[in-house]
């Protein structure tokens, strides 16, 4: 109900609403995930700010494990992805990158909302 949605919004559970763009309908056929290795921890602020300026980078996460940052990129095709890597990512002074190309998104969903105490 609208009252419930308003309550969830007021609690900060719902942050807003957005349109979901079909990347293939707007010409972006390639979805890639990239693990980024930084040369030094001091690069985090400058690299994340630079990544915000690259429109094809749609997500950026600080991670544990082998990568310093993990990003999601949409590109028109594999050649465009290569161009993004060479012309936009390499100039950031990264130690190295690892790419994973997604063939197809199997599913995507939001986490379930359970506001009841589980005590």
Regions found by a protein language model. Give the residues of each.
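A compositional/biophysical signature of low hydrophobicity enriched in polar/charged and small residues
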Residues: 1-119
């Amino acid at each position: 109900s609208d009252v419930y949605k308003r309550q969830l919004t007021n609690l900060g559970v719902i942050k807003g609403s957005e349109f979901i763009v079909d990347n293939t309908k707007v010409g972006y056929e390639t979805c890639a995930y990239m693990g980024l290795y930084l040369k030094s921890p001091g690069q985090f602020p400058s690299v994340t700010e630079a990544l915000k300026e690259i429109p094809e980078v749609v997500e950026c996460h600080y991670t544990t494990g082998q990568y310093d940052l993990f990003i999601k990129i949409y590109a028109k095709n594999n050649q465009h992805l290569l161009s993004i890597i060479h012309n936009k990512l390499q100039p950031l002074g990264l130690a190295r990158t690892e790419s994973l190309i997604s063939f197809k998104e199997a599913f995507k969903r939001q986490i379930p909302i359970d506001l009841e105490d589980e005590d």
